[in-house]
């Protein structure tokens, strides 16, 4: 029998949500996604010990504000993780713009361009990289500009149709609507358990996928943030799914039949609309789940970025001693 992972690969582009080099080499995804949490975890492994030494040595040679230096070294390390992943996948690696820039379009643009330049310095073309931005109004506006410059973007922390509509308006390359974090919110709010078919996160991604296909929107839908293999199976056929290694392993061991749940041919009419800033902000205001999970996600990524910068500061201090 064919594993569910292999069956999934026939209808969906499988992406690994990890910086674990060994897992990527073993599971052979098409793309990889990273975030500050994943980068921090990867840097804790022996594989990146030399990269840390190199980045710290580079940082020692830089002048200026210590906070700016530690931030630059942290960026360099994130690029090191991304560059290692690029060697292992045929497709793209997503690298995230600092979460603390989520409400600053111009600063997000500057950071995104510097990420692309840093990859180019390592001989990696921009068509191998996706710039990952939070799906705030400001992040979406930054993505709109970057797309016009030929820099493809992955809009993350997406919890609502309002965000998906705004991303479509901006003609972004790819969105990452979250599944598991939506489920978390509803389970906490209602005290209920949900089957995969009832899962509010699954329903949200299906609605967004249908809206895009019904209106011939080219933006790729990549479901993200899974709590179970059941959620993944419920979205089989989605353009892409980014999945953690433990769930990829679970699917690889399961030789049951996988049923396709999503296809462009199955789309239902859903009239195309556009959102301006005030409409977007009002729709988000009316969606408590999306508002809370977006804010929570930004805080969590900012916290892990802060942890990475603190680690870098300590390494720089030790190197200077």
Curated annotation (Swiss-Prot):
Q: What does this protein do?
A: Transaldolase is important for the balance of metabolites in the pentose-phosphate pathway.
Q: Which organism is it from?
A: Rhizobium leguminosarum bv. trifolii (strain WSM2304)
Instruction: List, alphabetically, the Pfam families matched.
Output: TAL_FSA
Task: Output the PANTHER family linked to this UniProt entry.
Answer: TRANSALDOLASE
Tell me the active site.
132
Q: Where in the cell is it found?
A: Cytoplasm
**Known catalytic reactions:** D-sedoheptulose 7-phosphate + D-glyceraldehyde 3-phosphate = D-erythrose 4-phosphate + beta-D-fructose 6-phosphate
User: Of which family is this protein a member?
Assistant: Belongs to the transaldolase family. Type 1 subfamily.
Cite the PROSITE patterns for this sequence.
TRANSALDOLASE_1, TRANSALDOLASE_2
Pathway terms, separated by semicolons = Carbohydrate degradation; pentose phosphate pathway; D-glyceraldehyde 3-phosphate and beta-D-fructose 6-phosphate from D-ribose 5-phosphate and D-xylulose 5-phosphate (non-oxidative stage): step 2/3
Q: Which gene encodes it?
A: tal
Q: How does it assemble?
A: Homodimer.
Has keyword Hydrolase? no
Give the first-level EC class, as a single word. transferase
Instruction: List UniProt keywords, sorted A-Z.
Output: Cytoplasm, Pentose shunt, Schiff base, Transferase
Primary location recorded for the protein, binned into one broad class: cytoplasm
Superkingdom of origin organism: Bacteria
Q: Which GO terms describe its molecular function?
A: transaldolase activity
EC number(s): the record gives: 2.2.1.2
Q: What is this protein called?
A: Transaldolase
Q: Which Gene3D superfamilies match?
A: Aldolase class I
Q: Which GO terms fall under biological process for this protein?
A: carbohydrate metabolic process; pentose-phosphate shunt
Q: Which GO cellular component terms, listed alphabetically, does the Swiss-Prot or TrEMBL entry include?
A: cytosol
């Amino acid at each position: 029998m064919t594993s569910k992972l292999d069956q999934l690969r026939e209808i969906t582009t499988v992406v690994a949500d990890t910086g674990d080099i060994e897992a990527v080499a073993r599971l052979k995804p098409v793309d990889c996604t990273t975030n500050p949490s994943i980068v921090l975890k990867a840097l804790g492994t022996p594989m990146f010990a030399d990269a840390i030494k190199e980045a710290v040595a580079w940082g020692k040679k830089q002048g200026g504000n210590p906070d700016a230096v530690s931030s630059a070294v942290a960026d360099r390390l994130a690029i090191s993780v991304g560059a290692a992943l690029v060697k292992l996948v045929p497709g793209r690696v997503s690298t995230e713009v600092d979460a603390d820039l989520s409400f600053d379009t111009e600063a997000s643009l500057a950071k995104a361009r510097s990420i692309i330049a840093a990859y180019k310095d390592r001989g990696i073309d921009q068509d191998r990289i996706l710039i990952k931005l939070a799906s705030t109004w400001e992040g979406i506006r930054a993505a709109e500009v970057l797309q016009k410059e030929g820099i493809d973007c992955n809009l993350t922390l997406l919890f609502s149709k309002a965000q998906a509509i705004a991303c479509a308006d901006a003609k972004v390359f790819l969105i990452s609507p979250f599944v598991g974090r939506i489920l978390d919110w509803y389970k906490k709010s209602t005290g209920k358990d949900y089957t995969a078919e009832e899962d509010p996160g699954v329903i949200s991604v299906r609605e967004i996928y249908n809206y895009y296909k019904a209106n011939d929107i080219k933006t790729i839908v990549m479901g993200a943030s899974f709590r179970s293999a059941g959620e993944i199976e419920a979205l089989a056929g989605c353009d892409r799914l980014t999945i953690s290694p433990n769930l990829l392993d679970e699917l690889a061991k399961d030789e049951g039949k996988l049923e396709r749940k999503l296809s462009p041919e199955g789309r239902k009419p859903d009239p195309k609309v556009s959102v301006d800033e005030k409409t977007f902000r009002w729709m988000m205001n009316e969606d408590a789940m999306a508002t809370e999970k977006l804010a929570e996600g930004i805080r969590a990524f900012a916290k892990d970025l802060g942890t990475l910068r603190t680690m870098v500061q300590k390494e720089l201090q030790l190197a200077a001693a």
